């Protein structure tokens, strides 16, 4: 997948603009407030039907307008068009090849995105749910049945929590547990299948950033590895019932990062943590591209302020190997001069 043209109308501070891009590394250069990050945000919005900058979607609409529109022409390898519009206090309207979509799933499948921005580096210190999203992203693209299993599992956990809060009889909880265990086992299998591919790739790429970094990367499924979920739920029922929430299950899955059994945030410097996240993002893209004809697109916001020049160069070289389309923002052109080659495209705004 690559985007050849992007048109924005009333998206943040961009009233109406059309941009052409190359299927290579695209540098977006401009001062703070010029709209660089808004371009990345609009592409991300097209893929995910949400923003990575704000949950207040009305604020994304230009203050002089009542609606924003995002439109793109892309190739996969055939030409496709994707558009998304939103009016104030209304829902998103998504179109794929001019056809309105009931949900955004097909567009997300057509437009795989990896985002690297300053907030990406917080994943190590975030909760398990955020780290598990790394696995779920990859499993979604690796296995077309994953989404339905994930949705059903999420529904059953929510249903169980609701039953606990409303003091439903234990027999009713058991009926939910039976279904939950069935879907949880399938979900765990699919997550494990993706993690098995991801783990060695992270180690491989991280060694190019810093061969001296040693760490352990493990997948925790959300309950005791040596017990069935049914057994764990039965044993923990009194505790769950006391606090009115399900404390074990696939919703508690996590990627555990450690060094000699100590949390990585207690061992790695902030700079080393950034290298790990870059390796993680590159590993996801490489696995995706090897399993799909539809290559992943990278959105990278102001990376030169996050990494030194040596590690930034390593990141760029890996991105070139992936042959993915890349969008990179920067405030100063001189910061990227050493990374520009004949295939690069520079957009100054």
From Swiss-Prot:
GO cellular component: cytoplasm
Keywords: ATP-binding, Cytoplasm, DNA damage, DNA repair, DNA replication, DNA-binding, Nucleotide-binding, SOS response
Protein residues bound to ATP: 30-37
Highest taxon of source: Bacteria
Signal peptide: none
Main location: cytoplasm
Gene3D superfamilies, A to Z: P-loop containing nucleotide triphosphate hydrolases, RecF/RecN/SMC, N-terminal domain
GO annotation terms (biological process): DNA replication; DNA synthesis involved in DNA repair; double-strand break repair; SOS response
A single GO molecular function term of this UniProt record: single-stranded DNA binding
InterPro entries in the record: DNA-binding_RecF (IPR001238), DNA-binding_RecF_CS (IPR018078), P-loop_NTPase (IPR027417), RecF/RecN/SMC_N (IPR003395), RecF_2 (IPR042174)
Localization per Swiss-Prot or TrEMBL: Cytoplasm
Family stated for the protein in its record: Belongs to the RecF family.
PANTHER family tied to this protein: DNA REPLICATION AND REPAIR PROTEIN RECF (PTHR32182:SF0)
Function comment: The RecF protein is involved in DNA metabolism; it is required for DNA replication and normal SOS inducibility. RecF binds preferentially to single-stranded, linear DNA. It also seems to bind ATP.
Protein name: DNA replication and repair protein RecF
């Amino acid at each position: 997948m690559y985007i050849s043209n992007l048109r924005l109308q009333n998206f943040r501070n961009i009233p109406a603009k059309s941009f052409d891009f190359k299927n290579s590394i695209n540098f977006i250069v401009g001062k703070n407030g010029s709209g660089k990050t808004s371009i990345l945000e609009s592409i991300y919005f097209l893929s995910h039907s949400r923003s990575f900058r704000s949950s207040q979607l009305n604020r994304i609409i230009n203050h002089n307008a009542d609606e924003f529109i995002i439109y793109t022409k892309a190739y996969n390898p055939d030409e496709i068009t994707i558009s998304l519009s939103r009016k104030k206090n209304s829902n998103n309207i998504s179109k794929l090849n001019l056809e309105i979509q009931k949900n955004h799933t097909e567009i997300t499948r057509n437009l795989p995105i990896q985002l690297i921005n300053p907030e990406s580096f917080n994943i190590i210190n975030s909760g398990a749910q955020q780290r598990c999203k790394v696995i779920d992203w990859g499993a979604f693209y690796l296995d077309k049945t994953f989404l339905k299993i994930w949705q059903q599992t999420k529904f059953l956990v929510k249903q169980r929590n609701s039953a606990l809060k409303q003091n439903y009889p234990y027999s009713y909880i058991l009926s939910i547990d039976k279904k939950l265990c069935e879907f949880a086992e399938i979900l765990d299998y699919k997550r494990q299948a993706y993690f098995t591919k991801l783990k060695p790739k992270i180690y491989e790429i991280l060694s190019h950033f810093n061969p001296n970094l040693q760490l352990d990367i493990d997948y925790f499924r959300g309950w005791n590895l040596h017990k069935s979920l049914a057994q764990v739920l039965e044993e923990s029922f009194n505790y769950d019932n006391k606090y009115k929430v399900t404390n074990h299950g696939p919703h508690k899955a996590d990627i555990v990062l450690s060094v000699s059994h100590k949390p990585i945030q207690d061992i790695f410097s902030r700079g080393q943590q950034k290298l790990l996240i870059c390796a993680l993002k590159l590993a996801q893209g490489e696995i995706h591209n090897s399993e799909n004809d539809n290559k992943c697109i990278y959105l990278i916001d102001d990376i030169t302020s996050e990494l030194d020049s040596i590690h930034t160069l390593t990141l760029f070289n890996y991105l070139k190997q992936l042959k993915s389309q890349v969008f990179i923002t920067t405030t100063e052109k001189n910061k990227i001069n050493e990374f520009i080659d004949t295939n690069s495209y520079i957009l100054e705004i």
